[in-house]
Design a protein with these regions (language model features):
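Auxiliary, metal-adjacent structural segments of Zn-dependent hydrolase domains
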Residues: 7-86, 208-241, 472-473, 478-486
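TRNA-recognition modules of translation machinery and tRNA-sensing kinases, especially anticodon-binding
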Residues: 105
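Well-ordered beta-sheet/strand-loop patches within structured domains
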Residues: 135-138, 154-243, 247-251, 315-407
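Short pre-active-site segment immediately N-terminal to the catalytic Zn-binding motif
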Residues: 65, 85-102, 261-267
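Non-catalytic terminal regions of proteins
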Residues: 93, 97, 291-495
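Fold-level signature of zinc-dependent metallopeptidase catalytic domains
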Residues: 2-5, 9, 92, 113, ...
């Protein structure tokens, strides 16, 4: 796709790139392409990439985006790909003011992709990788047939969230050989050396019993399969499920792609806040707009940060919290002295003019994801200043009403929504359950029950890959249940 920029836009891009680098942004080489709304919807339907493996979900997403644009419900102003070089798409129909804003916004994203810790393990050549995946799937379709491949991809996509988003940053566990396992299982109880007459005091029975219990527990652990609960369910299926070579390859590709997209979900608020912070700064002070453009910019900006009761706007929350951090660190509103000050007037007037705000913002950009960002910096002052509340829907009036103003509850609710990117934590507990090769999963309950219809379809699709009965333990209305699918029927039992 080659859509060269007009001379006027090239000049804008060069100017904003120079200004962005001058304030410390460090981004990949960024390539801009100009596209119409149909082309942008196609790219957006593909998850931001110009090509993907053939599947009906892309067409469905394109129809949704097209109708949303036609009815005036949404407009995509830009798309940016985490790649080196970074590719960004500009909507041809945008006004010149919008194009300037979007270009500045893109440089913020590109800087974030390059420097944020949570993106450090992503494939920086994913544009090529996606094209390779598309080629591989097309070859498999030619060999196996479209319907069979498409049906298997349907199954894989329904399970794509069963990964461990922390896995790229975890050290690989040491694996023991069978000989080492046998030695550990049959090791004798270790006694502390002592004189015979002191043995009963140095090695009392309760000490020896504890040692024996530890050995027994370790033996059980080493003999279990897997030895530790595995959150990356897809990896477990890839390694141990009885699949054909092409199926294993397709599932591996879908897993790899989901790991690529995971950091974007983990940092949505901070990433969008960072890009919005810099496009706002660029348009108003670093590379200011003309007086004739300010009204259009403000109208565009107000649309970006608009919020509604009961919903989190990541652009608004991200940029406002970053500005709050900047103000706090510029005025020295951190540390023991400030935290221990209870007087509201003293806190409000606190200003040591330390001016560490900019330095702190770059530190936040480098180290945090949404959970740590909110957990560390969302404080009571910000909550009150931003008028953040919890809302419930009133069925009688048909409106959202404030249900809770308590800061701790508000923060807890936001963090709960963000933990594990909003997905349930499910782990493989036993790959040989009942000693019959059946699969046992466990849902780590966080207060919310699993959606029952989703749960039934999930274990049904895992069965299609595992080919043996699949069980999952969870809480249903605070009662421990084990739900299973044996290839024909679902069963549920109390445990």
């Amino acid at each position: 796709m080659q859509n060269s920029l007009p001379i006027e836009l090239i000049s804008i891009v060069r100017n904003l790139e120079e200004k962005a680098r001058s304030v410390g942004l460090d981004f990949f080489t960024t390539m801009f392409e100009l596209v119409d709304y149909k082309q942008l919807n196609e790219i957006a339907a593909y998850g931001g990439f110009p090509t993907r493996y053939p599947h009906w979900r892309w067409g469905m997403e394109y129809e949704r985006l097209s109708k949303s644009y036609t009815y005036g419900l949404s407009v995509i102003y830009e798309m940016v790909i985490n790649n080196d070089p970074c590719y960004a798409y500009l909507l041809r129909a945008n006004s010149l003011v919008a194009q300037k804003t979007v270009v500045a916004h893109v440089y913020g994203h590109s800087d974030f992709f390059k420097n944020n810790f949570w993106f450090s393990k992503t494939n920086r050549k994913m544009l090529n990788q996606m094209a390779n995946h598309a080629t591989i799937v097309r070859k498999i379709i030619d060999e196996v047939g479209q319907e069979e491949v498409e049906n298997f991809i349907d199954v894989c996509l329904s399970l794509e969230n069963l990964i461990d988003i922390q896995a790229p940053f975890k050290a690989k566990p040491k694996t023991l050989t069978q000989e080492q396992k046998e030695k550990a299982i049959h090791q004798p109880v270790t006694k502390i050396e002592s004189k015979p007459y002191m043995d009963s005091y140095v090695n009392p029975n309760d000490f020896l019993e504890k040692q024996q219990s530890r050995i027994v527990e370790q033996a059980k652990k080493l003999q279990s399969f897997p030895e530790e609960p595995v959150q990356d369910v897809l990896k477990f299926l890839i390694e141990y499920a009885p699949m054909s070579t092409w199926q294993r390859r397709v599932l591996s590709m879908i897993r790899d792609e989901n790991y690529y997209f995971a950091p974007q979900a983990q940092t949505k608020i901070l990433n969008e806040g960072w890009a919005t912070y810099w496009h706002s700064k660029m348009m108003t002070s670093i590379a200011p707009l003309d007086a004739s453009e300010i009204i259009d910019y403000c109208d565009h900006y107000s649309g970006v940060v608009a919020s509604q009761p009961g919903q989190i706007n990541p652009y608004r929350l991200g940029v406002e919290l970053l500005r709050h951090i900047e103000e706090r660190w510029d005025k020295g509103r951190f540390g023991k002295s400030y935290v221990e000050t209870d007087d509201p007037k003293t806190r409000r007037d606190w200003n040591t003019s330390i001016n560490l705000g900019a330095k702190k913002l770059f530190e936040v950009r480098s180290l945090h994801n949404d959970v740590t960002f909110i957990d560390e910096f969302l404080d009571e002052d910000f909550c009150h200043k931003s008028k953040m509340f919890l809302y419930d829907y009133n069925t009688r009036t048909g409106k959202f009403v404030i249900s809770n103003r308590d800061f701790k509850e508000i923060k807890k609710t936001i963090l709960k929504q963000l933990t594990n990117i909003g997905q349930p934590i499910i782990k493989v507990i036993d790959g040989n359950f009942k000693n019959r090769g059946e699969l046992l999963l466990h849902h780590f309950h966080d207060g919310d029950d699993l959606k029952y219809d989703y749960l039934l379809e999930c274990i049904k699709n895992i069965y299609k890959i595992w080919t043996r009965p699949v069980h999952i333990e969870t809480l249903v209305e605070n009662v421990k249940r084990r739900i299973a699918f044996d290839g024909n029927t679902h069963t549920i039992e109390k445990i």
